[in-house]
Amino acid sequence: MYNFGKTVNQVVIPDLSEQIILKTVAKAELEFKEKEIAEKMTALDFYYNINMDKHIEQYFSSESLQQIPTYPSKVVPRFARARMMLYKSPPKRYFNGEINDDYNNVAYMLDSQTKQFSELSWLLGCCHFKTKYNQMKERLEYEILPNVKEYYLEGESHPYGYSYEIDKGNKKDRQYVFWSEDRDGTPGMHFRFDQKGKRYAIAGNEDMVNPFGLNPISKVVYPSSSYDVVRSAIQIGIAMTEIALSVRNRLGQPVFTGIDEGQSVIKSGIDSAIILPEGGTFQYVSPTGGLDEMIEAVKIFANQTAENNHLRIRWGDSTGNAPSGEALKILEIENLESRESDIPYFKEWEQTRYEIDKRILEVYNVMTLPDDYYVDFGEITYPMSVDQELKMLQWKLDNGIMTKRDLLLYFNPDMNDQELEEKLGEVAEERNQEVQQQREAQEPVSQIERILNAG
């Protein structure tokens, strides 16, 4: 394993002395490198589709943008969703080999949060995920933390603590939260602090002690970020703004020749006549270059970025029949391979996150969860013809891979247990009636019954 050094978000703490820890924490926050943070914040702006104008406006003069607004595109979230297929369908979480509905009910919005977390982890290269318990609503809640500072003890590779900003305020009064875990008999800490290193107790925790003993923060780290997608989005935004300016200028720039400088400002319009001196001319000059070529150049930016990330783009003006499911699978083979490479990262993270959830629920006396936990990530499916789908379902039923209950959920995943039981009862009743009718049709009929039936 190669070690190319720690990032600016990793800080070494010399020892467990409380005062040294406090000084190190405060100093680390002040030494945050602006460039790395700025790049990350730009990526977040483009992912959440906010504040994108400011990243494009800097490449244009103020006069240009008085004529048209900037033209940013939602490239980054679309690339992130297309690339991160692991949580496209919610995974199944097993506890001692069974699904625990009690846990699923208390883990509020876990599936949607993990999906967004996976996309940001891929985009940023590293992302953190915090679990907390909402006592008022009696549920676990999750928070994605893109900007987190990690703290390490000398000689260790596992983080001892974390801090993150909670209130930017102004530049002189920023607020942060610090968590650390129990280590060598020393209780972990939990408190709020400011830029000067002054600590503040969080309500209900005057001792500033971590009640869980472990950090309620987990993380996923990729070998590299995907900032090339962000840069491509900026480039596409610049190009699209240029195209918008070109469209605005298609009518052309009014040009006069053969007139004095003092006459350069002339009122014009369909209800105004322009009197030109002898030898003077007036015309509109349009910019050269076709819009089609400019649009094709934008497509090249997008296509190249997609290829670099094992993706492909099917443009709206593409011709031909829609590809079949098998053809789509072949076209997506590189992305499917990337999905397989994502599994180890998130299996390990799911285990760490579960241990945090388990501990928090125990501390709040909500429930005790087993140690055995397993995540089954859903397989990627592609559209099939009706005939193919029916044959597949029948094969699964015939071979015991799917039950009638599974079949009902396949067509209606939102059915609750009561609806399922009612529907299964109807199916069983109809089946019994069919069997009875077949039996009656096969039984011999006596001469008397024939006479009675005929009458």
Can you say where each PLM-predicted feature lies in the sequence?
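Extended, helix-rich architectural segments
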Residues: 1-140, 455
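C-terminal anchoring/interaction modules
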Residues: 2-6, 263, 269-277, 282-287, ...
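Short, charge-rich amphipathic segments
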Residues: 2-22, 27-61, 222-243, 266-291, ...
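Intrinsically disordered, low-complexity boundary segments flanking structured domains
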Residues: 34, 71, 81, 112-119, ...
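Short secondary-structure junctions and interdomain/linker hinges
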Residues: 51, 110-114, 120-128, 237-262, ...
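Generic detection of long, well-ordered alpha-helical segments
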Residues: 100, 107-111, 119, 226-233, ...
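Extended, regular secondary-structure scaffolds
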Residues: 119-124, 128-219
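Extended, charged amphipathic alpha-helical segments
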Residues: 200-334, 363-367, 375
